[in-house]
From Swiss-Prot:
Upper classification of the organism: Eukaryota, Metazoa, Chordata, Craniata, Vertebrata
Taxonomic source organism: Homo sapiens
Cellular location(s): Cytoplasm; Late endosome; Lysosome
Highest rank taxon of the organism: Eukaryota
Subunit structure, interactors included: Component of the SIFI complex, composed of KCMF1, UBR4 and calmodulin (CALM1, CALM2 or CALM3).
Name of the protein: E3 ubiquitin-protein ligase KCMF1
Gene Ontology terms for molecular function: ubiquitin protein ligase activity; zinc ion binding
Sequence similarity: Belongs to the KCMF1 family.
């Protein structure tokens, strides 16, 4: 295993990269490759001051630590997630955290869980000292039953770290009366190492498979519940979306109705105003054209009607002419009589006797006789 399978660099986004892997113990699920770590890659949540745990592949671990002898008391190196100091074993890391960071309650990621095969690489805890005491106790404090647990936590070459941990050559497995496995220390020898490598690797693989299966079983329950929750959320979101769509449709229909009603009212108002304007304009045109070409609209008359109309017009014109002439003649005669009377007055003023015409004299006589006959007789004396 020369690659970090299933891991990608969060800076350059390279997946299944080779070489060293640096995992941040403060940021959740943040990994860097060697080049990005050495170049000082940072983000808004990750800085260069964050403690990083180095994880090696199997090839790099054999290259760096091949041929070295380590006992069970000297596992691989870990980094303190609080102060960033490196080179701790499980025992020394627990002692360091208990003595130096007992009162610290910051949420950090366990470096041991991140390095174990099948462990949770993003296990966050706010009581790191209690987590180390419960989950990562030293091998000398373990009994036979916990020895099996320690074998399950044995180093896997594909996820090793920069420091040494219990080597496979130092682990001897013998069958006990109860059928369990027990570990004992022995002196280092290449022949023993080569002989025990396949068995240790097989056991480590079996432990990793068991742990992964247990993790899958443990995660199957919450995954099913999470799926149910997601389905419920999707149903609720769909219901909300349908309600929102219905509200939008009703609002659109209402706006359309109001628009159509307003359009109809405006149309009726415009038609009424246009009709009123047309009637007013027609009346104005009729008033203006009362004496202009009115006869064009008259119906056509027959020949007899036309002759009768012309004769009536001729009679009217003659009557008007005679009336005008008579008025003019009367004015002239009256003016001439006045002139004659004035002359007679002037003649009488000169002492001359007025000569009465004959007819006038006769009329005066007749009037006098008639008056005498009509007078009543005088009363008797």
């Amino acid at each position: 295993m020369s690659r970090h399978e299933g891991v990608s660099c969060d800076a350059c986004l390279k997946g299944n990269f080779r070489g060293r892997r640096y995992k941040c113990l403060i940021c959740y699920d943040y990994d860097l490759c060697a080049s990005c770590y050495e170049s000082g890659a940072t983000t808004t949540r990750h800085t260069t001051d964050h403690p990083m745990q180095c994880i090696l592949t199997r090839v790099d671990f054999d290259l760096y630590y091949g041929g070295e002898a380590f006992s069970v008391e000297q596992p691989q190196s870990f980094t303190c997630p609080y102060c960033g100091k490196m080179g701790y074993t499980e025992t020394s890391l627990q002692e360091h955290v208990t003595s130096e960071h007992a009162e610290t309650s910051t949420e950090v990621i366990c470096p041991i869980c991140a390095a174990l095969p099948g462990g949770d690489p993003n296990h966050v805890t706010d009581d790191f000292a209690a987590h180390l005491t419960l989950e990562h106790r030293a091998p000398r404090d373990l009994d036979e039953s916990s020895g099996v647990r320690h074998v399950r936590r044995m180093f896997h070459p594909g996820r090793g770290l920069g420091g040494p941990r219990a080597r496979r050559s130092n682990m001897h497995f013998t069958s006990s009366s109860t059928g369990g496995l027990s570990s004992s220390q022995s002196s280092y020898s290449p022949s023993n190492r080569e002989a025990m490598d396949p068995i240790a690797e097989l056991l480590s693989q079996l432990s990793g498979v068991r742990r992964s299966a247990g993790g899958q079983l443990n995660s199957s329950g919450p995954s099913a519940s999470q799926l149910q929750q997601l389905q419920m959320q999707l149903q609720l979101e769909r219901q909300h979306a349908q309600a929102a769509r219905q509200q939008l449709e009703t609002a659109r229909n209402a706006t359309r109705r109001t628009n159509t009603s307003s359009v109809t009212t405006t149309i009726t108002q415009s038609t009424a105003t246009t009709n009123i304007a047309n009637t007013e304009s027609s009346q104005q045109t009729l008033q203006n054209s009362q004496f202009l070409l009115t006869r064009l609209n008259d119906p056509k008359m027959s020949e007899t009607e036309r002759q009768s109309m012309e004769s009536e017009r001729a009679d009217r014109s003659l009557f008007v002419q005679e009336l005008l002439l008579s008025t003019l003649v009367r004015e002239e005669s009256s003016s001439s009589d006045e002139d004659d009377r004035g002359e007679m007055a002037d003649f009488g003023a000169m002492g001359c006797v007025d000569i009465m015409p004959l007819d006038v004299a006769l009329e005066n006589l007749n009037l006098k006789e008639s008056n005498k006959g009509n007078e009543p007789p005088p009363p008797p004396l």
